[in-house]
């Protein structure tokens, strides 16, 4: 372990020195630094993309850092199970056995959040018992009708592995953890001989007033939209359609005076969840006027057009382009491929702004 840790530390030191060198050089050549904002409504996948940047372009997560996420994974599972249990009454779904119903009541009263380093054995037994009930799984399938983390099904289907002694979260486990972003989270990395300063800002309504402090000298912004949330409502008010809220927010961002010269990339995220959902939940939940087929190709193209139509930016007589990518933030290979293409766009637009392209 000592050898592994020293190699990880050495890699981190080398990257840190390279970042320090580029920061020093940046005083002479500002084009070497790319300031990138991640914007979007809450739960659109911004924080997951930021984690991917660390995995792809930095040292990733050491064994010790992965252990720290154990409590977060446990907490996410317990919150998800509690949410499903509470939703069953609202959805009029019954437990299949009285024992499972009794265990569910015990689980709700258990005095832990799960954010400890180990799960009590009694809690593990209750969680597995409750998850085995077909009523719980029916309620999970109807998660659009209440508030539930996207990761719930992923974690619950792997309870045996996650609840095993000495469990250490995998990279995929970490990518799916849900921690509400408050304030501004920054990460730095070097890619294609550029220093990237990436800022993830909270997406909930209460957090958006903090965005203004990031607007100065922005090279590019990535606006994230969760495709799969077209039939869901906001956590904040339980009435407003989430995609309608994202459209309104995107309108205010892409046509903002701060971003007239800024490269804007639209990430239509959670395409995997959208592809599963669209065949059983029509797009008319969000767009009553939609007359196309409820399949991935037509429905995703329609959503893309709705967002791109919001763009009113012009420079002189020329419309400023929006660059759209369909993404799955939990798929490292997809994000690696997409970010490579996006980086070329950002560098090209930055050179053009400086009159060098």
Curated annotation (Swiss-Prot):
A lipid is attached at residue 3 (S-palmitoyl cysteine). Residues 35-48 are annotated as: G1 motif. The keyword Lipoprotein applies. A lipid is attached at residue 2 (N-myristoyl glycine). GO terms for biological process: adenylate cyclase-modulating G protein-coupled receptor signaling pathway; cell division; embryonic axis specification; establishment of mitotic spindle orientation. Gene3D superfamilies: GI Alpha 1, domain 2-like, P-loop containing nucleotide triphosphate hydrolases. Residues 32-357 form the G-alpha domain. Signal peptide: none annotated. The keyword Cell division applies. Mg(2+) binds at residues 47, 181. Residues 173-181 are annotated as: G2 motif. Residues 196-205 are annotated as: G3 motif. Keywords: Cell cycle, Cell division, GTP-binding, Lipoprotein, Magnesium, Metal-binding, Mitosis, Myristate, Nucleotide-binding, Palmitate, Transducer. Residues 327-332 are annotated as: G5 motif. Disruption phenotype: Simultaneous RNAi-mediated knockdown of both gpa-16 and goa-1 causes, in the one-cell embryo, a lack of nuclear rocking movements from prophase to metaphase and symmetric spindle elongation without transversal oscillations of the poles during anaphase. At the 2-cell stage embryo, nuclei are mispositioned and fail to exhibit nuclear rotation. In addition, causes a loss of gpr-1/2 cortical localization in 2-cell and 4-cell stage embryos. One of its GO terms (cellular component) is heterotrimeric G-protein complex. Guanine nucleotide-binding proteins (G proteins) are involved as modulators or transducers in various transmembrane signaling systems. In the 1-cell embryo, probably together with goa-1, controls nuclear rotation and spindle elongation during mitosis. During the first embryonic cell divisons, plays a role in gpr-1/2 cortical localization and in the proper orientation of EMS blastomere mitotic spindle. G proteins are composed of 3 units; alpha, beta and gamma. The alpha chain contains the guanine nucleotide binding site. Belongs to the G-alpha family. This is Guanine nucleotide-binding protein alpha-16 subunit.
